[in-house]
Swiss-Prot record:
Lineage: Eukaryota, Metazoa, Chordata, Craniata, Vertebrata
Naturally occurring in which organism (per UniProt): Bos taurus
UniProt entry tagged with the keyword Endoplasmic reticulum: yes
Residue ranges with Polar residues bias: 320-348
Coiled coil: none
Spans through the membrane: 28-48, 75-95, 120-140, 154-174
Domain of life according to the entry: Eukaryota
Name this protein carries in UniProt: Macoilin
Recorded name of the encoding gene: MACO1
Amino acid sequence: MKRRNADCSKLRRPLKRNRITEGIYGSTFLYLKFLVVWALVLLADFVLEFRFEYLWPFWLFIRSVYDSFRYQGLAFSVFFVCVAFTSNIICLLFIPIQWLFFAASTYVWVQYVWHTERGVCLPTVSLWILFVYIEAAIRFKDLKNFHVDLCRPFAAHCIGYPVVTLGFGFKSYVSYKMRLRKQKEVQKENEFYMQLLQQALPPEQQMLQKQEKEAEEAAKGLPDMDSSILIHHNGGIPANKKLSTTLPEIEYREKGKEKDKDAKKHNLGINNNNILQPVDSKIQEIEYMENHINSKRLNNDLVGSTENLLKEDSCTASSKNYKNASGVVNSSPRSHSATNGSIPSSSSKNEKKQKCTSKSPSAHKDLMENCIPNNQLSKPDALVRLEQDIKKLKADLQASRQVEQELRSQISSLSSTERGIRSEMGQLRQENELLQNKLHNAVQMKQKDKQNISQLEKKLKAEQEARSFVEKQLMEEKKRKKLEEATAARAVAFAAASRGECTETLRNRIRELEAEGKKLTMDMKVKEDQIRELELKVQELRKYKENEKDTEVLMSALSAMQDKTQHLENSLSAETRIKLDLFSALGDAKRQLEIAQGQILQKDQEIKDLKQKIAEVMAVMPSITYSAAASPLSPVSPHYSSKFVETSPSGLDPNASVYQPLKK
């Protein structure tokens, strides 16, 4: 019998690192860094009166233009710049200033936090809420402290550039989906043609191809299981769990069906399903435990060793079926899995055991024993091995539960710290609101103080001007007094010096001065008279002005009356025209009435003539005799009766014997 030994490679388990605390501390420091950067940028914005966060999208735009020029050419880079410029102009023209600044700042900070390694989680969402609240509550209203005209183009770029990038991303996504759809269509066509080719082959070659495919899939599953083991050790969930567990089951079912068909064809009378029910139930229990513990074992190398057991185990099972039915219970699940042509599910338990015991040398021995082919193991040893695997799996389950409890305790501590942080955030928000109110009051007081200072400065300037004017007048008065005192002193000195010499000249001078004084008094009287006359003239002129005002009022009233009279004249002329039209219509009506009356008189005359003629005819009618008795008919009334004729005076004589017509 051909013997195949399987090589079991040593599994090197990496050291288990507790990354929970490391992740928590790293994330807290990361978000603290974000908050520090945000606070520094806001402080720089407030101090330098410029929105520095708007420079980040501009820098991204420059990098994207450089990359497009480097990898896609000049034409695409120029097209990208034109599209971005157009989008910026549209945002600059059609979005209001306050909403533009709010949307730009909010987008910049949200995008900055979005680019972290953490993605969407509770701290990022809380930071987003904080940014949006600060932008909407504080910075949305205070735009006076910034250079609006300088910041507005950058704000428009912060909105227009992401719109352009989203447009290009949507285009690439649509093209990617269309390409995937085309690939799927081509893949379906290829599979259809491949199935046609396989169905055209003989059944022996089809079986060979199936076995080759199964071997390839088993070989491919080996590195997948290695990666899943590493991920499981690092605390992740294996992504290829379903694939690796379902492959042995699929092979088991397919080969079991083929085995049943062969048994029916050869009429062996062996029912493997009824014989191996206890073993199957135990295997299903083990597989259930494996699926819940997420443990696997690398045993794809044992496929070759199980192929040699197919004939022996089938023969022993058939002989025991004929001899003793109790021997089936003692058969190992490894022989059952070998007869059905599938890999035993206990191999995944051995894999888990190999993982858990790789730290000790005894674990290495167990691993080497597990790699021995199945045909060298005895039946009790297999059951013992399975029980040991179950115990170890239970120990692993307890360890995982302990880890779960530790994680839950850490989650509870984190939730308590989160609550404390939320309470601190609420207190900080209240303090922030109080500080905002204080700042608002301080700004209002500052504005009031500025207004008061400007008013006081104006008053001070007016008082300084008045003071300078009064000082000038005072200086002039002082100068004039000094001049008068100097002239008086000179006059006194001159008089004292020449008192004895020129008395006569002084007397003459006094006389002349007295005469001049009299003349001046006369002139003063004349001037006063002239002033009185002028005052009288002024009064007369004032009266004349008042009269002129009255005349103006009268003229305005007169013009109004003239307008009214003109309007009345126009209305009167219109009324006269209407009256003339009415009179002319009345004359026409009278004429028509007279004509109608004349016609009526003519008709009356004609009626009278007709009546006379009728009377003459009636007068002639009695001379005509009719034979009334000869006819049995009733008497006929005459066509003309005197009853219908009105009694009117006629010129005919009814007593005349012979009718004599009137001569015309």
